[in-house]
Amino acid sequence: MVSRIVLLDAGPLGLVSNPKPSQQNLACAAWLQRLLESGVRVIVPEIADYEVRRELLRANKQPGLMLLDTLAEALDYLPLSTAAMRQAARLWASARQSGQPTASDNTIDGDVILAAQAQSLDVSDLVIATTNVGHLSRFVPAQLWTEIEPLT
């Protein structure tokens, strides 16, 4: 039996890899622990790792980088693939053809890459945990991380 799969978008991944003990960071870390304890399979997509990692590197936040590395090793990690990137290109083009782009034309669109990574798993019980459902929910199931419950 396949359990529910939750992919972490950059928002929640950034919260759980932030060593600062803010209320939101601690709440997100506790939420992640509850998911794991209930049997939810939590995955770090490579595009989300990239988005969080580049900012941690820019700001020279070594403790955050260490936490991010630990998470990437402790959880399942979904590397980018040629198939996912080609699907992302199709999603990007389709969004523009329908007059609803998800990012400006000259940026790498992390949302469509994340959506394509999620689609590449080809499973029915999957959701992306995010802090901004908007663009993602056009392509794949996405919810605010605060609304995703552990398995019962």
Where would I find each of the regions flagged by the language model?
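Acidic, metal-associated active-site segment
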Residues: N106-L126
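A generic structural signal for short hydrophobic patches within well-formed alpha-helices
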Residues: L13, D49-V52, M85, L136
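Short acidic-hydrophobic, aromatic-tinged amphipathic segments that line or gate anion-handling sites
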Residues: D76-S81, L144-L151
